[in-house]
Amino acid sequence: MLITDIINQASSQLREAGIETPEHDAKLLLAEAAGVELRDVDRALLMGEELGTTGQLAVFRAMLDRRAKREPLQYITGHAPFRYLDLKVGPGVFIPRPETETVVQAGLDWLTKNGMIHPCVVDLCAGSGAIGLSVVSEVPGSQVWAVELSPNTAEWTRRNLSETAKKYPSIASNYHLEIADATSFATLAQLDGTVDIVITNPPYVPQTDIPEQPEVRDWDPELALYGGSMDGTLIPERIIERACRLLKPGGVLVMEHDVTQGDRLVAFARATGFAAASTGQDWTGRDRYLFAVS
């Protein structure tokens, strides 16, 4: 069967299942099953060629059925891109989002602007390790301390540390993972008053705002989604309190939050003891993260 027919049929199946980007998802899954790049699929489509062995096409159809049931694309392929990393993901770990790349960039820009050498960085609510592993691989000499509450999720963090260290061997001794409650004052207490920057993407979804997308609602771990209160700010506020003790004078907290929470969290940060606090925007112009100076 020509690849054009394969993609057309697959796109139709995904479209009927309510997938927003059926053709893209079909092409990406075929590339994954056939062990080629997405551009190879596009080229085969352009040239009207065949692609994939019988066995590979069987794998593709199985992946397609999973996607039609609204399983996240990244869980099916087993990995998710984040900045310069390709992170392993699967059921039980939060899939890193593009908007979090903006949060990381804000932190890295601050480190660069202030000429930080060998900065001490903390990633609270580490999940897949996206934030901390990005920092430790992009900022030479940085020491990153990551905290994750779930032992199961921490296994994904360790996997991604192992994979990232293959590309950046020096980071193995610069990344430290603790399985603990990120909001507890006992967690990383030995670092209190010494941290240059805390970059974090805590659970913040309001309990009144259950996600409509099945990929999020039915698959992302609830522990990584909901902020512990009706408006979703309970856990973010506890993270602010913890970060305030961790940071040295002049240190910075960069924390992702819901688009509805900016003003409240800025006010809370100032009331907690931060000298300055403001809201940063993501690439769509929406209020997306707190930037607070100790």
Curated annotation (Swiss-Prot):
InterPro entries tied to this protein: DNA_methylase_N6_adenine_CS, HemK-like, N5-glutamine_MTase, PrmC_N, RF_methyltr_PrmC, SAM-dependent_MTases_sf
EC primary class: transferase
Binding-site positions, S-adenosyl-L-methionine: 148, 201
Keyword list, A-Z: Methyltransferase, S-adenosyl-L-methionine, Transferase
Gene3D superfamilies xrefs: DNA helicase RuvA subunit, C-terminal domain, Vaccinia Virus protein VP39
Keyword Methyltransferase: yes
EC number(s) from the headed UniProt entry: 2.1.1.297
Domain of life, per lineage: Bacteria
Reaction(s) the record says it catalyses: L-glutaminyl-[peptide chain release factor] + S-adenosyl-L-methionine = N(5)-methyl-L-glutaminyl-[peptide chain release factor] + S-adenosyl-L-homocysteine + H(+)
Keyword RNA-binding: no
Any one of the GO BP annotations: methylation
Binding site for substrate: 201-204
MF terms (GO), sorted A to Z: nucleic acid binding; protein-(glutamine-N5) methyltransferase activity; protein-glutamine N-methyltransferase activity
Annotated family: Belongs to the protein N5-glutamine methyltransferase family. PrmC subfamily.
Family matches, as PANTHER family: HEMK METHYLTRANSFERASE (PTHR18895), MTRF1L RELEASE FACTOR GLUTAMINE METHYLTRANSFERASE (PTHR18895:SF74)
Record's function text: Methylates the class 1 translation termination release factors RF1/PrfA and RF2/PrfB on the glutamine residue of the universally conserved GGQ motif.
Name of the molecule in the record: Release factor glutamine methyltransferase
Origin organism lineage: Bacteria, Bacillati, Actinomycetota, Actinomycetes, Bifidobacteriales
Gene name, Swiss-Prot/TrEMBL: prmC
